[in-house]
């Protein structure tokens, strides 16, 4: 008897397992991991409009209390609902896109469970003084579980659904009812889920926040007309030599230890003069006391013996400079000879000045002598004429 080969559709279908599925405990570490579609959003078209096969649908309906998918199929007749229920489901569907709703509690990291922004978006409620937290989930929450891609991930999807279903079973029965205005999970942007630390940082002057059509948060720099995905003060650290100081008197400011100054503006933020605040602290550099008098160091070449050839070179005309091969000297020797030439030049200037000074003194002496002679001549010749 010939064996019939399996077609592609039959190979892709998950194998049916007879019996009851056993719940697999999800590791707490894996629950804290955020899936990639929450961090970055859907980057490729997801096949979310496909309907579940009958085999998987029966497995879901056994533990899902008869939840029916929102997508209509020609193989099954649509479920008859009351007009009030249809209007409520349509309002929830339009208020939050299903592609950005939180799929399950395991998809959200636990550290956001205690943050204020996530609490408001999951809609905790406290009624009649009861401090116990009440969870309310919309129909989109269950529809998102039914619309996940099929294939080799069918058992994983069932594990997520069973985990959420067990959470509902552990809740009291009186806490599962819907209240007005709380039975809807709002569409949380990706920027709110990933940038909780940047919300605490203030935006520099000229910056604003906006969201894309898909709900991703970005920052606009109106000073340079540019956009950025990350916070302007979060993506860059402090430059070397800077320190952030949190003072109860002056607030948070930044200190530049290199230039000894302080400012409120982040050193990496763009400077807008009309928005810049005055510095919190004015540094006054301490003047060092001069205990010792400043002494000019003596010229070491005053006592050095100057070579004869260097004295000849200093007095020789410029046309003989090519005779010396300066490239044969070492650099240290050239520095030494340069200092000696400066010393000879200073001595020559000193000698010239002394010669001019001696000449000036001789002129002054000659003038004084001539004046005395004229006075003496005038006195003696005057007495001779009078006698």
Swiss-Prot record:
Residues 323-370 form the SARAH domain. It comes from the Eukaryota. Keywords: Cytoplasm, Nucleus, Phosphoprotein, Repeat. Phosphorylated by STK3/MST2 and STK4/MST1. Phosphorylation is not required for SAV1 stability and may increase the number of protein binding sites on the scaffold molecule. GO terms for cellular component: cytoplasm; cytosol; nucleus. PROSITE patterns: SARAH (PS50951), WW_DOMAIN_2 (PS50020). The modification Phosphothreonine is found at residue 212. It is found in: Nucleus; Cytoplasm. Coiled coil: none annotated. Residues 201-234, 236-269 form the WW domain. Transmembrane segments: none annotated. InterPro entries: SARAH_dom, Sav, WW_dom, WW_dom_sf. GO terms for biological process: cardiac muscle cell proliferation; epithelial cell proliferation; hair follicle development; hippo signaling; intestinal epithelial cell differentiation; keratinocyte apoptotic process; keratinocyte differentiation; lung epithelial cell differentiation. The modification Phosphoserine is found at residues 95, 138. One of its GO terms (molecular function) is protein serine/threonine kinase activator activity. Homodimer. Stabilized through interaction with STK3/MST2 or STK4/MST1. Interacts (via SARAH domain) with isoform 1 of NEK2. Interacts with ESR1 only in the presence of STK3/MST2. Interacts with WTIP and AJUBA. Regulator of STK3/MST2 and STK4/MST1 in the Hippo signaling pathway which plays a pivotal role in organ size control and tumor suppression by restricting proliferation and promoting apoptosis. The core of this pathway is composed of a kinase cascade wherein STK3/MST2 and STK4/MST1, in complex with its regulatory protein SAV1, phosphorylates and activates LATS1/2 in complex with its regulatory protein MOB1, which in turn phosphorylates and inactivates YAP1 oncoprotein and WWTR1/TAZ. This is Protein salvador homolog 1. It comes from Rattus norvegicus (Rat).
